[in-house]
Amino acid sequence: WVVAAGALVLYLATLHSWISFASLPAVSHVGGCQDLPQTKQPLLYLFTLPLKLLPASALPFAMNGLAAVFGALTLALLVRSVALLPHDRTKEQRQREQSEHSLLSIGLNWMPPLFAALICGLQLSFWQHSTSGTGEILNLLLFAYVIRCLLEYRLDDKPSWLIRATVVFAISIPNNWGMIGFLPLFGVALLWTGRMRLFREGLWLKLLFTGIAGLSLYLLLPLVAVMTGSGYSFTEVLTDNLGDQKSFLSNLFSNR
């Protein structure tokens, strides 16, 4: 939390003063300046829903401030995740590190998390999205939380960590097409982390149902469009988001 507080102060001090080119689409949707209904990033829509109550002049600053909070929380999760990394991958590590769960126990064990936070937090793209309300930093925050949950499960074997990871990953997919590409890796990570316990205790059913529930976020913006009388049908709004995600993924793999 010390790192998160320091990062928040830094990002607030260097906050974008107004609307950037990258944040224009998100800010215009929140401010109601778009003629078309919002069809993408349903999770960002939920987080920014209270900001619609603000006057238009305060909206850009509020969006940028929210991005700074997301950026600071992402670094806090990064610090925790690095601290949880096991140090028993090689024979030499197993000989030197005798602590429980093979966590780094030397006097300078605070340096790797701090170094990771500095490298990530001061990286130009990360800094830009943490000081401008583009909405991209929310995607990274969710990704960081999923990794943290998988690492926490290794310590206490509580199934709730795997359930949290599944829920957050599932709600990330409608908001970010990139998470679809990570889905096979996430499945492998769940199997590797949970091992046979997933099948002995019926945990896989809980993960399946919570994942499906998270994916229902795809339906949020189509419902909003219909309820607000935007003139667009439920199917049109839904297929616009799904079509864009399919297009991004197709272009990604076709260019390799």
Predicted regions mapped to residue ranges:
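Membrane-interface transmembrane helices that cradle and orient dolichyl/undecaprenyl
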Residues: 107, 143-162, 171, 190-196
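Start-transfer (signal-anchor) and selected internal transmembrane alpha helices
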Residues: 1-10, 73-76, 102-114, 205-213
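Transmembrane-lumen/periplasm boundary regions of multi-pass, lipid-linked membrane glycan transferases
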Residues: 136, 180, 189-256
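Short hydrophobic/aromatic helix or loop-helix immediately within or flanking a transmembrane segment
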Residues: 31-61, 65-69, 76, 172
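Transmembrane signal-anchor helices characteristic of membrane glycosylation enzymes that use polyprenol
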Residues: 1-22, 120-122, 211-229
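Short acidic/glycine- and proline-prone juxtamembrane loop motifs at membrane-interface regions
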Residues: 22, 125-138
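Membrane-interface alpha helices of multi-pass inner-membrane proteins
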Residues: 117, 161-175
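Transmembrane-helix motifs of polytopic, lipid-linked glycan transferases
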Residues: 65-102, 117, 142-152
